[in-house]
Design a protein with these regions (language model features):
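Alpha-helical transmembrane segments
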Residues: 334-338, 402-411
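Intrinsic disorder/low-complexity segments
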Residues: 414-426
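Extracellular/periplasmic helix-loop-helix junctions in multi-pass membrane proteins
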Residues: 376-393
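Basic, alpha-helical nucleic-acid-binding regions used in initiation and control of genome expression
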Residues: 164
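Cytosolic catalytic headpieces and adjacent flexible linkers of membrane translocases
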Residues: 1-143, 147, 161, 173-175, ...
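Membrane-embedded transport module
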Residues: 100-153, 167, 174-346
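Hydrophobic alpha-helical transmembrane segments in multi-pass integral membrane proteins
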Residues: 300-304, 365-380
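C-terminal membrane-solvent junction of multi-pass transporters and transport-like membrane proteins
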Residues: 282, 286, 346-366
Length: 426
């Protein structure tokens, strides 16, 4: 507006200085000018006033940005404001620091002037883009995607629509335009950046819960498969009947899926870095855990199976009582391992916030009561016979090391390694 006004050079310089000072404080400025005229004029106006408007950031934004940084999420600010205003806002939210290099900021026209190769090499280091146009935002998204990044874009205006549409996840604001909402995948009703952080936490927690269920189910299947194969190799009848396997794989696994999927989200997942899109859901660590735990369950059960086959002649084979002990022991091993599955991928104890995981406790109770009901009343259908309370106590006791060994391993992993004096370090 000042370019349309008639004023002295000194006055114009004074106004420019004031504007820079306000922009450095992240103020947005609005100028008023007038002139007597019968039609619109763009020259000879008289400057009336300049207003500096403060649009303070929300108090929860800096903490949310810091959470993103800890989670390995790189936050970039793209705005139509001037460079000075954009950098000050970035400083307030925590994406710009005193040691941030100048090349981490660029204007939209300068970004458009870069060649594709130059922009590609620089785009990951950018933190602030000012005076950005719709094409600049879209180009930024496309270049980040070429680097293999998963890109989420927030916006509320019509000019944000191209970037929202091309991003992996487009997030429009509830107060935004209908064009932005139609181009986005998710609408933030509360217009809060913190909601994005919560969505990431929920998504990562759900992914972790799926890993936990797969770990639990595959341990059951590995151990059961090995036992069936071992029984065939030894020449004995199947140690687990079809109905027993149905109870283990169908009912128990369904309950376990409900319990593990309902575990509440944990802020702990925000301390880990993002996974690659090509990563297999079962990490090498989980795969080894499935194999090792499955074998550790298989070994004592195999020893029990061999011991039950110790007799020869007319009494050869496992009687119903021994089959019941075998079946119940196997189920209780999985019952204890459900707590290990809860703590999978965490350094916390399996008992951490256990009382708040009511669905898990309910499922464990249902499995325990269901197993008791099958053993007590299953009869010929499940090929079982009732067990005494003493036998139940012994089975629960001898199978509990599955949990205690897991607890010790988590404790050792959580404990910091003792530091060596400087002279003893390699």
């Amino acid at each position: 507006v000042t370019t349309f006004c008639t004023m002295t050079t000194d006055a114009r310089a004074d106004i420019a200085q004031r504007l820079r000072a306000w922009q450095d404080k992240a103020y947005r400025t609005l100028a008023f000018a007038c002139a007597p005229c019968e039609e619109i004029r763009t020259t000879g106006l008289t400057l009336q006033a300049i207003v500096a408007i403060s649009d303070p950031i929300r108090t929860d934004v800096p903490a949310a940005v810091d959470q993103c940084r800890q989670a390995g999420i790189n936050v970039k600010m793209v705005t139509g404001d001037t460079s000075a205003t954009a950098i000050e806002i970035a400083r307030q939210i925590g994406t710009w620091g005193p040691n941030t290099p100048a090349e981490a900021q660029i204007t939209g026209p300068d970004f458009a002037a870069l060649s594709d190769e130059e922009a590609y090499n620089r785009v990951q280091r950018l933190r602030v883009m000012s005076r950005a146009r719709p094409t600049d935002k879209q180009r930024l998204v496309n270049l980040l995607q070429r680097h293999g990044e998963v890109v989420a874009v927030t916006g509320d205006g019509t000019n944000d629509a191209p970037a929202l549409n091309h991003a992996h996840v487009g997030l429009s604001l509830g107060s935004g335009t209908s064009v932005a909402k139609n181009a986005s995948d998710i609408t933030l009703i509360d217009d809060s950046f913190n909601s994005i952080v919560k969505a990431v936490m929920w998504g990562r927690s759900l992914y972790k819960n799926i890993q936990r269920f797969l770990y639990f189910q595959l341990v059951v299947n590995v151990a059961a498969l090995l036992l069936v194969l071992a029984g065939a190799a030894i020449g004995t009848e199947l140690p687990l009947t079809v109905t027993q396997i149905l109870w283990i794989n169908l009912i128990m696994d369904t309950f376990a899926a409900m319990a593990l999927a309902s575990l509440p989200p944990s802020a702990e997942v925000m301390k880990s870095k993002p996974r690659r899109q090509t990563d297999f859901i079962l990490t090498h660590r989980i795969q080894w855990a499935i194999i090792v735990v499955g074998l550790l369950m298989f070994a004592p059960m195999l020893a029990f199976l061999v011991w039950c086959e110790r007799e020869t002649g007319a009494n050869a084979g496992m009687d119903v009582h021994e089959l019941t002990l075998f079946f119940t022991t196997f189920v209780m091993l999985q019952w204890w391992n459900l707590l290990n599955a809860k703590a999978l991928g965490s350094d916390h104890s399996a008992f951490h916030q256990l009382l708040s995981d009511r669905t898990l406790l309910l499922v464990m109770l249902l499995v325990l009561v269901g197993q008791w009901g099958i053993v007590t009343f299953g009869g010929e259908m499940f090929r079982v016979t009732p067990l005494s309370f003493k036998e139940w106590g012994v089975i629960i006791l001898v199978t509990s090391p599955v949990l205690w060994i897991g607890e010790m391993l988590r404790l050792l992993r959580k404990s910091p390694s003792p530091s060596l004096p400087r002279g003893e370090r390699g």
